[in-house]
Amino acid sequence: MGQKINPLGFRLGTTQSHDSIWFAQPTNYSENLKEDKKIRDCIKTYIQKTIKISSGVEGIGRIKIQKRIDLIQVIIYMGFPKLLIDGKPRRIEELQINVQKKMNYVNRKLNIAITRIANAYRDPNILAEFIAGQLKNRVSFRKAMKKAIELTEQAGTKGVQVQIAGRIDGKEIARVEWIREGRVPLQTIRAKIDYCSYTVRTIYGVLGIKVWIFLNKE
């Protein structure tokens, strides 16, 4: 059987860059890794609590972390940054203070910046969130998948593949359903493919959503 490799790790250094940029001694490496996860979780929790959206999409594409001795630079790539900035102009400052408190930073400065993703539905994380929201609202999985593919096609992608696994529609036996539109060349390293794996809790149990988006060839 074919062994499935993570499409992002497979393309690191060619079309894909690292989300965490720092150097550490082997002894401190795990601590730095834990710290990165804590920062990301902290930001996601704050945004979940702060933003109440009808569609249920938070719109976080990815969170990049760059570390220096005295500074931690965090860049949040969002599909809908207005949701965080509108209404309260001081929200980013609030978020910064909140993360700084939880991480107990004394000698290090934390700086958070927000970058807007031009086409939100070209990002697999935002698309997976959209599908998860639809499934939570008991929309038929086929309808949710077709709508997601429609949105990515409008965003100007070359191909998209969506897969949902688990007890779909509450059926007793778990199964895998998938749909593909356009080309998704997973074995071509030059092909710029974005990928996301997302878990959603529904009333029937846990479902796994995977999204592959073929953007272009470099």
Curated annotation (Swiss-Prot):
SUPFAM superfamilies attached to this UniProt entry: Prokaryotic type KH domain (KH-domain type II) (SSF54814), Ribosomal protein S3 C-terminal domain (SSF54821)
A Pfam match: Ribosomal_S3_C
PROSITE patterns for the chain: KH_TYPE_2, RIBOSOMAL_S3
Main location: plastid
Subcellular location: Plastid, Chloroplast
Membrane-spanning residues: none
Ranges where the KH type-2 domain occurs: 47-118
Gene Ontology BP, a term: translation
Plastid listed as a keyword: yes
Lineage: superkingdom: Eukaryota
One Gene Ontology term of the molecular function aspect: rRNA binding
InterPro entries per record: KH_dom-like_a/b (IPR015946), KH_dom_type_2 (IPR004044), KH_sf_prok-type (IPR009019), Ribosomal_S3_C_sf (IPR036419), Ribosomal_uS3_bac-typ (IPR005704), Ribosomal_uS3_C (IPR001351), Ribosomal_uS3_CS (IPR018280)
GO cellular component: chloroplast; cytosolic small ribosomal subunit
Keyword annotations: Chloroplast, Plastid, Ribonucleoprotein, Ribosomal protein, RNA-binding, rRNA-binding
Subunit comment: Part of the 30S ribosomal subunit.
Family, as annotated: Belongs to the universal ribosomal protein uS3 family.
HAMAP family per UniProt: Ribosomal_uS3_B
PANTHER family per record: 30S/40S RIBOSOMAL PROTEIN S3 (PTHR11760), SMALL RIBOSOMAL SUBUNIT PROTEIN US3C (PTHR11760:SF19)
Designated name of the protein: Small ribosomal subunit protein uS3c
Organism: Lotus japonicus (Lotus corniculatus var. japonicus)
